[in-house]
A protein has these predicted regions:
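Non-catalytic DNA-recognition/assembly elements of restriction-modification systems
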Residues: 312-377, 508, 515-554
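Sequence-specific dsDNA recognition surfaces
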Residues: 357-372, 386-418
């Protein structure tokens, strides 16, 4: 409630400023000192209900109302625009109360796209949720008509919201309170464009009546606005949840998906959650869908004045047919599709190439039962991502495991050998480790030095005996560490908090097979790197030995 009062103070002050500006009497705002008397004076002047005036002046919600009143006044005197003034307070509200507010840069991009769809100032644009506040203000400033649907109990006092066009100096606004936080995508054929995003505290939103349970069908598709934008968490592009999978199928199969954009991190105030924009068009002549990756951190909230050129999408990203999207399992992952059409992938598949699964055996690491104290055990070491150095060589693992009798056979099968390669498929996705100079001695059950197994975040690669004439472990290792292949892994990485990559994408990785001489050359370079690294380690140890030890002074 405290944060809501802060926003209402700023909102009301901006409203009075707009009123006084029309009258040419801004000095009266600058001269005001006390918040309570200010509210009573100008609330009555504007014709606000006496209960609303009393609520705004009620100090039980916030004892330092004068601070935010004076802060807003100062921003007005400094020439700060109404939208920037409100957003500065909204950021505080978002941080403390959990209400998500769009960054101004993202809002500018969304508004630019939506306004380009409006034929004239009478065209209605639908926006949903309090998060859309900056989008609404930008559209109103451009003199457009906005229908704003938002959940009940949002931060700004609902009785004040109809005055937003007065604050923005233009536009028309229709307010509708959403029941049960349901945000319709459309439903009014007069709306040329629609903007939908998660509302309030809700993680998801509803498309038409309820797309999670009843995705778009033929009848509801007819109710879609001519052009619509959905802003949602990027996870919706690849989530395996049945409802979201079905939602993607409907968008693709009905050919109403025009573009998919991956936005920079930080699109919402005080949140690292990544957003994606889905642009829908009810009537489309083309069967191609545009994919564009704008996830560069340089475009994040730290540089919040960026603006995605929605009107020039044809010059960015790649186009993928709806047939190809269906064949991919209706995955809308932007990085995957951009990479599939990239120069890097063409480089990887130039000349002779085979899928990784055709060249190596791929084994996913499994947990090994530890000793429960009931019998003899075996000591082993488990390789973690932190055990891989900058060159990709696995140094002596630090994690020791005592394997129980029931886990010995599994441990022996998981043994790492010289030339094995590890790929991280969870967490540090794409990190490559090479097993160098190790020979497990399974006859000694207590010595763990040469008994290494891969941690559960890895898959183990071992060249098939039938393929040793085509490549060496050293060449494959250097190939997997190349920038092009690392970009491939990044494009297949799913998830935000804990990234992961599917086994199918590892297996399908194209491996370029050059001439034998080139492979031998890469193997020689690998060995040269190892020689240099060993020399560096020797010199580092020599430097350490030259350090002064006070105990040696006589």
């Amino acid at each position: 409630m405290i944060e809501q009062q802060q926003l209402n103070i700023t909102y009301f002050t901006l409203l009075v400023n707009a009123h006084l500006t029309e009258q040419g009497n801004q000095e009266q705002l600058y001269e005001a000192k006390d918040w309570t008397s200010f509210v009573h004076t100008w609330g009555t002047e504007l014709g606000l209900h006496h209960e609303l005036i009393a609520e705004l002046a009620n100090k039980r919600y916030f004892v330092d109302a004068n601070y935010f009143f004076q802060r807003t006044k100062q921003q007005i005197e400094d020439g700060t625009s109404p939208i920037d003034t409100i957003l500065s307070i909204s950021a505080d509200v978002s941080r403390h109360s959990g209400y998500p507010i769009l960054q101004k840069g993202v809002a500018k991009s969304c508004a630019a796209y939506l306004s380009s769809c409006a034929e004239n100032s009478d065209t209605a644009i639908l926006c949903c949720g309090f998060s859309a506040l900056p989008v609404v203000m930008i559209l109103l400033t451009q003199g457009l008509r906005v229908d704003w649907h938002f959940p009940p109990r949002d931060p700004i006092e609902s009785s004040l919201l109809p005055y937003l066009p007065k604050i923005c100096g233009a536009g028309q606004l229709t307010i509708k309170s959403l029941e049960n936080r349901i945000g319709p995508l459309a439903g009014h054929k007069s709306m040329a464009s629609a903007f939908v995003l998660p509302t309030g505290y809700s993680v998801g939103f509803y498309l038409l009546p309820n797309y999670w349970d009843s995705p778009i069908d033929g009848e509801s598709a007819e109710e879609l606005a001519d052009t619509s934008m959905i802003l949602h968490f990027a996870e919706i592009l690849w989530s395996r949840k049945q409802a979201q999978q079905k939602f993607r199928e409907e968008l693709v199969d009905r050919n109403i998906l025009q573009s998919v954009l991956l936005l920079p991190p930080g699109g919402l105030n005080f949140s690292g959650v990544q957003l994606a924009a889905l642009l829908l068009q009810k009537v489309r002549q083309s069967n191609l869908v545009q994919f564009a990756d704008f996830s560069n951190e340089k475009l994040s909230r730290k540089d919040s004045d960026w603006q995605i050129p929605f009107d020039s999408l044809s010059k960015t990203g790649v186009k993928v047919s709806v047939q190809s999207l269906a064949a991919s399992g209706y995955l809308l992952d932007v990085k995957r599709h951009v990479m599939a059409c990239s120069q890097e992938l063409q480089t990887m598949t130039a000349g002779e190439s085979l899928a990784l699964k055709d060249l190596v055996s791929i084994t996913r690491a499994q947990s090994i039962p530890e000793n429960d104290g009931s019998g003899s055990c075996m000591a082993i070491r488990e390789v973690l991502a932190s055990d891989i150095n900058d060159l990709g060589i696995i140094r002596e693992p630090q994690k020791n495991i005592q394997v129980g009798q029931n886990g010995v056979s599994r441990a022996i099968n998981a043994w790492l050998k010289h030339g094995d390669i590890l790929i991280a498929i969870k967490g540090s996705v794409g990190k490559i480790g090479f097993v160098q100079d190790i020979l497990a001695d399974i006859t000694d059950s207590q010595d763990a030095d040469n008994k290494w197994v891969a941690g559960q975040s890895f898959v183990k690669l071992r060249i098939k005996p039938s393929q040793t004439n085509k490549l060496t472990p050293e060449y494959l290792f250097r190939y997997l560490k190349s920038p092009q292949v690392q970009k491939y892994f990044a494009s297949r990485s799913l998830g935000v908090s804990i990234p992961m990559i599917k086994m199918a994408d590892i297996e399908a990785l194209p491996v370029r097979l050059p001439a034998k001489e080139a492979i031998e050359g890469e193997t020689a370079l690998h060995n040269k790197q190892l020689t240099i690294e060993k020399e560096i380690q020797r010199l580092q140890q020599e430097l350490k030995n030259l350090e002064l030890d006070l105990n040696t002074l006589s």
